[in-house]
Structures are given as structure tokens and as C-alpha cells.
């Protein structure tokens, strides 16, 4: 009796969709080599069954923020941490880990690294060294994924040739196989639809509830709507940046929030671009559709689609498909090649989708930040069916911002501090951030209701008795404006702990965000006054020949910082995710080392890690 067919299990944990894309690509590449593969999210997998997967298991996990794991990974990870599992629980399992992260962050690919160690501790055997995809790589995470996959296939073949009966490098040609789209679109005759009066919230919930993937499963319906009441430029005309102060009021319902919370806004797409996309795809914007997973051998979703209320196609595109700003992923070009009728377009698309064309695709697509519409216009012979477009067009994602107001100081209002994103591509094309440029274009008198979701960020609201050391260069000052405003209100009726704040920007005269606010609180008797035990310290990096940053100012105030830490202060850091968080941490390590009598950096690092574990060192960084 012959040996049973080998299989590959690919488990992924994704927050933004990149890990899902990578996992599906691994699954597709395995099947093209004759190895059946199942691709499953960690939150849909029975973790207790993992020891029974004696064949190969590949884990694809992303790391977000400062070493945070995706929401879909948390329950899976808690299960693996159970002490009763023992060192031999996974002794039959062979595994490989591929991580997606950004080396600009201090805890680069932290989730993949800790998963790899835990699997090994539980007795599993690694197939190959873990792969670490890096957003900073010229080709993104795929720059690491391509050679890592090649090594994976060849190592599996060495372990057991049954994995690839024809060899690890023999693939079914791309032009001979095409997957079925995962989603099915039903078009409805308008005359058969019953008219329903729906609120904006219901329409958004309906559209995003049909949207592919698990990215929106817990937040299809907005928490509420906001209306802009103020749009103020904070930077001077001479500045190289455009930073705005926005104020909003609640529409119909009010949501309670705390300082340090984050609000996500769903931006509006340019209606003319949406119309052009729909026309380019040969679709009727007024048609009504329902969207649902395609039926498979093991499951039927027809009942789910029957219970859905149809939605207008244009509304669905506007609310769920980012056709105006996001660049398509590599798989989009592969599917395009199947539908190209012009031979030269087909060849170009196949090249872009191949490992050999990866760098050229990156230069054409990601570096230029080409939109879906621009790519489709560059290949006019391609006519992709709408079910494929629903699957492949990047989802329209809410954009997250740190709230810069306090509910105590600014009742029934939400304030945001937003840098308006704009850049020039290598081919000298001006590109703008979708959400920030849209917000900048709004006038307070416009009746635009913005759908929003509130949630906790990485900066927990501090009690008024907790001393604070705040570090917020640039727009990193946003959450701390709320912190200071709230503590100033609290101080009117009861004692509050002191606050030190370190702010930085390029130029004092052009980029000093909220200057009057900070300086008023730094005066005698103010929340940031040294007389109250606090302080306000500024670093203007370009105002002198030698650049000065917040970490330099922190070191200058070494004694006062240490005294406040000894009094139980918590450190809060917010701002750019590039070098700043690491440089600030290094400054605190120097202070701890110096003030404790010249101890080593390693001892200081452990001391600060203890602060992190007890919630006294918090970082919120963004790219």
C-alpha cells in the first residue's frame, strides 16, 4: 500500500492583510509543485489539534507597533503558553516560521521570534531557519519571502521526496492554471427589490459586512459619526510640513473616550476616480449586489448570501475597495495576466508576477504608489471579472489617529493633530495620503458626517496621582496635549502629580506645534512648570549647526528625570517609528546607568524592561 499524499498546513495571523497575502502565496506555490496546502487563520484553527499535524506546518505572522501581535493570534498564543503542555507536546511536528515586520521598530519581528522559540520549546522540529520579512527591504517582505520559500521546498524534498514527487522546482506553468475567486457576486434586478430606508450607519455596516477577509469582522458598523468644526494649519507657510489641528463634534450619539485613546476614520474616496474605475471595469454603478464567500466542497454560504440585503455597486466600491490610493499586490498582476488579450501585455504581467520580475514590479508599482485604476489603465486589454476585483483590490481601511483632546477639557468634542501626507515619487509624480488630504480639503461649514471607531491605543490613561515623563516630538505631541489639558482641569479641584514634557521639531519659528498651549502651562504655577515639579523642554533640530533631538534634552535633564522615575513616574513616548523610540530608550538607559553608579547598559535595559512590564514605559509609534 502506497504512502498517503503529503500535505502542507499554513497558519497565519494578519492585522493588515500582508501576512494573509504571504500565507496564500506560500499555499499557491506549494500546490503548483504538487503539494496540497490548507491556509487557515490562527483564530479559526483548533490549536489543541496541532500535535496531530505530523506533516509540515508553516506559520506566517506579522508584528505590529512595538512588538504587538495581531488580534487573531492572541488566543492561539495564550494556548501555546499553557504550562501543562510539556517539552514533547509537539515532538511529531515539523515547522517553519515566516515573520513580517519593520526593522525601523525596536521589536522587529518580535512575534515571529517568540513563536519560533515557543514551538521549539514544545518539542517541534524546525524545517529551516525562520524567515524575517522587512518592510524596509527595497522589495518589501517579498525580498525575503522568495528565497526563503525556495529553501523551504528544497529542504522538504530532502526530508521526504514524497512532498514533491516531480521535484521541488517543477511547477505547473502559470498560464495553465488559475484559481477560482474566493467570493461570489450576485446581481439583483432592481425592480424586484423592496425599498428600504437605511441610515448611513446601516449602509456602511452592510457594505463592510460583505467585504472580503476578516479585517472588519468586529467593526463593520461605525461607533458614531463626527462632523468637522475646525480646520487650522499649525505650521507656518515656510515650513516643509503641513500639520493641521482638526476639531469635531459628535453627530446624533456621543461616545465616551479617555485620553490616550485612538480614533479611526473611514476616508471618502474621490467620486470621479471611483466612477472612472467602475467604467474601466465595464460595470453598472447603479446595479445592486450581494457579496459572499464562494461555495466549496466542505461548506455552503448560499443561506448567508440570501439573508444579505443588496447594496448598490458604487456604494460597495466607495466604502470597501481602495481604488484611489492603495497599490495592488503581486497576485493582482498574476491574475491580470490571465485576462490580458494583448500578447505583449500578458508577457509583461507574467514577468511582473515572477520572482525574476520582482524588483521591476516594485519600481513600477510600490515605489510609484500606482493605484488600481492607474494599473488597469496601463494594461487596456485586461478585463478582470468583478468577483476577482472584490478579492484582489486592497480593502479601504480606516486610518488611526491619536486623540489630542481631553473629554474633561473638551466635552462633546474630539481633536486630532494630523500631518498632511504628500510626497514626490522617483518619476516626479506628486502623491497624497488619502485620509489626511481629504480631511485637509474639508471646510467646517460642510455637512460631511465622518464614520469613526474608537479604541484603546498603546498609551493607557494615567491616574492624576501618577507622575509623568512625556516624550512627543512632532505630531507625537498629540496625545500629550490631551494629557496636559485633562490634568489641568483635575488640578482645579484636587492635587495632581507633576509632569515633564520633552517636545521636538525642526524649527522653532515654523514647526512649533501648539506653542502657546505648552508655554502657557510651563509658566509659574502651570502644569508643566518646574515649580510644580515638572518641566517643558524643547529640541529644535535644525536651528543650529549641530542637530539637537529630544534624546539629547532628556540626557541634559538626567538628574530631574531620575528623581521623577524614583518617585514612581511613568514614561510615555509617542511619534515616528523610525529611530526615535530606540534613541529615546537609549537615553533613558544612559540615565539609569549613570544615576545608579555607572552600572552597565544591560542592567539599565533590564531595569527599563521591568518598567514596561508594570505599565510604566509606554510607546505609541507610527510610520
Curated annotation (Swiss-Prot):
The record's GO molecular-function terms, alphabetically, read: flavin adenine dinucleotide binding; FMN binding; NADP binding; NADPH-hemoprotein reductase activity; oxidoreductase activity, acting on NAD(P)H
What are the BP-aspect GO terms?
embryo development ending in seed dormancy; iron-sulfur cluster assembly
Give the quaternary structure: Interacts with At5g18400.
Q: One short Pfam family name for this protein?
A: FAD_binding_1
**What InterPro entries does the record tag this protein with?**
CysJ-like_FAD-binding (IPR003097), FAD-bd_FR_type (IPR017927), Flavdoxin-like (IPR001094), Flavodoxin/NO_synth (IPR008254), Flavoprot_Pyr_Nucl_cyt_Rdtase (IPR001709), Flavoprotein-like_sf (IPR029039), FNR_nucleotide-bd (IPR039261), NADPH_Cyt_P450_Rdtase_alpha (IPR023173)
**Gene3D superfamilies this protein is in?**
3.40.50.360, NADPH-cytochrome p450 Reductase, Chain A, domain 3, Nucleotide-binding domain of ferredoxin-NADP reductase (FNR) module, Translation factors
Looking at the record's lineage, which domain of life comes first? Answer: Eukaryota
Expressed, tissue-wise, as follows: Widely expressed.
The Enzyme Commission number assigned here is 1.18.1.-
Effect of knocking it out? Answer: Embryonic lethality when homozygous. Embryo development arrested at 2 to 4-cell stages.
Give binding positions for NADP(+). Answer: 475, 541-542, 547-551, 583
The species this protein was found in = Arabidopsis thaliana (Mouse-ear cress)
According to its UniProt record, where is this protein located?
Cytoplasm; Nucleus
Any single Gene Ontology cellular-component annotation: cytoplasm
Q: What is this protein called?
A: NADPH-dependent diflavin oxidoreductase 1
- What does the organism's lineage look like at the top? Eukaryota, Viridiplantae, Streptophyta, Embryophyta, Tracheophyta
Reply yes or no: does the keyword NADP apply: yes
The UniProt record gives the binding positions of FMN as 14-19, 62-65, 135
Q: Which cofactor does it need?
A: FAD; FMN
Record key words, sorted: Cytoplasm, FAD, Flavoprotein, FMN, NADP, Nucleus, Oxidoreductase
Which reactions is this enzyme annotated as catalysing?
A: 2 oxidized [2Fe-2S]-[protein] + NADPH = 2 reduced [2Fe-2S]-[protein] + NADP(+) + H(+)
